[in-house]
Amino acid sequence: MLALVRELDGVAVRDVARPQRREGYIEIAVGASGLCRTDLYVADGVIPVEAPRILGHEFSGVVSYVPAGSRYTIGDRVTAFPICATDRTIAGYGGEMLGVHCDGSFAEFVSVPESVVLPIEKALSYEEAAFSEPVAAALAVLKADLKSHQRGCIVSAGRIAELVSRVLKTQGLIVPVISPQVEEIKEGFYDYVIESAATFETWQAAVRAVKVGGVIVAKSRSVRPVEVPYLELVQKEITVKAVHYGSFAQAVELLNSGALHVEDLVGNRASLLEYRDVLTSARGGEQSKQFFVF
């Protein structure tokens, strides 16, 4: 099968063996797999992995192999949570992540534990269903115990911030997206601010925008250290609530039910052989998600 592989000296498309069949694991023929910052970090060597490693973790497709006694059958349309639980796993932390610790979904086939697989509706495109992972990440902000009577905003711009806003709207929370580069932010106005870019500029804006004693929800993930305005953080007695993942099952249900629409966030579709152009485009911005399709 064809796969996009991180090797010792970079990334390349290779013809590799299909996943080895294992007890309790389902093989999925990948329909579409989305590219995110984690994939770029692996491709660029910022996140070190054991080479060779197949990249990718946001995907959906069709079941192509099931072990004996499986609740799934060949041909079922499915997606999967990309972090396989271990006894160290807490809210997705400490497990093995597809495309990092084990081979991922930038391939014609991927093998995952049946325990992380969920069915998707026929009405969903493979690209829309692949949003289940970022939707689960967006749902994590609900762990900050946000209330409808509170004033909140999302400081950032682009696809991730827009997705968080839409997810919160499904839960009855109207939270606008504010880009500090182009909009004036009301100082000390918000009960909570969701930071979703992990830059000094967005942290500075978040600290400025939140009221004394308010909450900043740290949603974004960065493998690089991020400078924050520490003195103001302390002086305003701001609480920082860091969140990782919400419910993957809830994420899939939001997409399956049609309560959440993401089709306009789907960007360019390309084959694995076009990986150089796809990676270059993704490094340039996050207004829409790039996809490999099979």
Can you say where each PLM-predicted feature lies in the sequence?
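Short SAM/SAH-binding signature in class I
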Residues: 190-196, 289
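Mid-domain Rossmann-like dinucleotide-binding core that forms the NAD(H)/NADP(H) cofactor-binding site
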Residues: 122-187
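Residue-level marker of beta-strand positions
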Residues: 58-60, 76-77, 109, 140, ...
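Glycine-rich beta-strand-centered segment in the early N-terminal region that forms part
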Residues: 19-33, 46-84, 121-124
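Cysteine-cluster motifs in flexible loop/terminal segments that predominantly coordinate metals
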Residues: 36, 81-109, 113-118
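Glycine-rich phosphate-binding loop and adjacent beta-alpha segment
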Residues: 200-259, 294
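C-terminal hydrophobic helical "lid"/dimerization subdomain
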Residues: 249-294
